[in-house]
C-alpha cells in the first residue's frame, strides 16, 4: 500500500489493480471513498481496462478470432508494479502477459499515476501500444464515494451536479448482457445544473451518458457548490480524471 499525504488529505493506493483505496479528508475528519464492504460492493475505485462495461455475451471478435473477457476487463484484478514514487505522486505499471493475451491479444503497457496537490487528486492513465497494429481499447475510472458524506444527512439530501446544463440524455443497460440499449433514450431534467439523488434512481443499474455531454460532475448538498467532483478530461497523450475535495 502506498500513501500520499499533506495537511489536507491522506490518500492510499494499492498495488492490486493500482486501485485508489482511500481519500481521508483531514479537515472534516471523514473518509471520502467507499469502504469496499463485500456484502454490498467489494471495491473502492477500480480501473476499467481494456474494456469499460461488458462485451455482448462476454465475447469480442478481434482479427477474426473470438476472445472472452469479463465485465470491465482484467486490469482491476491484476498486480501492478510501482515504478516511481515521489513526495506527492505514485506511478504503477501493468504490462501484457501470456495470460492477458488470452482475453485481449495485444502487447501493451498501462501506466496509472496518482498525484496529490492540496485538496486536488489527479488520476492519469497512459496506455502504450507495443504492437505494430491498431489496438482497440477503452479505459475508465469507477470510484465509489461515501454518501451520505456528512453526519446527520441521508443519501436523498444530496444532489448530482453538472456543468450548468438544463438536461441530459441517457441510456440504460440491458441487465441480461450488461450492454447499453442505444435504441431508447431518456431525459434527466436538471435544475440549476443539478438533480436530487432519488430513491430507486439506479435500480436499473448505471445511467449511460454519451456524446460528450458531461465534462464535469459532482456530489453536493444543495447549499454547497460542490463537495466532491470528478472532471474527466483528455490530455495529450493520456486521459485522466481529477477529484476536488471541498
Model-derived regions: residue spans:
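Extended, loop-rich substrate-binding clefts of extracytoplasmic carbohydrate-active enzymes
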Residues: 66-118
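Buried hydrophobic-core signal for structured, non-transmembrane domains
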Residues: 13, 64, 123-127
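Active-site/ligand-binding surface loops and adjacent short beta/alpha elements
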Residues: 136, 147-233
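Residues that act as N-cap/strand-start positions at coil-to-secondary-structure junctions
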Residues: 5-7, 17, 54, 74-76, ...
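Beta-strand-rich N-terminal accessory domains
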Residues: 1-59, 66, 212-226
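A C-terminal functional module that forms or caps the active site or interfaces directly
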Residues: 226-246
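Intrinsic-disorder/low-complexity, polar/charged segments enriched in Ser/Thr/Lys/Arg/Asp/Glu/Gln
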Residues: 1, 8-10, 87-91, 109-111, ...
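Acidic, contiguous internal or C-terminal segments within carbohydrate-active enzymes
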Residues: 96-143, 150
Amino acid at each position: 500500500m502506498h500513501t500520499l499525504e499533506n495537511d489536507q488529505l491522506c490518500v492510499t493506493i494499492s498495488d492490486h489493480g493500482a486501485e485508489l483505496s482511500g481519500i481521508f479528508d483531514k479537515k472534516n475528519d471523514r473518509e471520502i471513498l467507499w469502504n469496499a464492504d463485500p456484502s454490498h460492493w467489494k471495491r473502492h475505485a477500480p480501473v476499467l481496462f481494456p474494456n469499460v462495461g461488458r462485451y455482448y455475451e462476454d465475447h469480442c471478435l478481434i482479427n477474426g478470432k473470438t476472445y472472452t473477457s469479463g465485465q470491465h476487463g482484467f486490469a482491476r484484478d491484476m498486480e501492478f508494479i510501482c515504478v516511481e514514487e515521489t513526495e506527492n505522486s505514485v506511478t504503477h505499471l501493468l504490462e501484457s502477459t501470456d495470460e492477458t493475451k488470452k482475453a485481449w491479444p495485444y502487447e501493451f503497457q498501462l501506466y496509472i499515476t496518482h498525484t496529490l496537490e492540496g485538496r486536488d487528486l489527479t488520476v492519469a492513465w497512459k496506455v502504450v501500444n507495443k504492437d505494430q497494429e491498431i489496438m482497440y481499447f477503452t479505459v475508465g475510472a469507477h470510484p465509489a464515494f461515501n454518501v451520505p458524506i456528512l453526519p446527520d444527512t441521508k443519501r436523498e439530501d444530496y444532489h448530482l451536479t453538472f456543468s450548468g446544463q438544463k438536461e441530459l440524455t441517457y441510456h440504460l443497460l440491458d441487465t441480461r448482457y450488461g450492454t447499453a440499449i442505444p435504441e431508447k433514450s431518456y431525459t434527466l431534467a436538471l435544475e440549476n445544473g443539478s438533480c436530487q439523488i432519488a430513491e430507486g434512481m439506479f435500480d436499473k443499474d448505471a445511467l449511460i451518458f454519451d456524446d460528450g455531454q458531461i465534462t464535469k460532475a459532482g456530489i453536493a448538498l444543495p447549499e454547497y457548490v460542490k463537495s466532491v467532483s470528478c472532471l474527466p478530461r483528455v490530455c495529450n497523450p493520456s486521459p485522466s480524471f481529477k477529484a476536488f475535495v471541498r
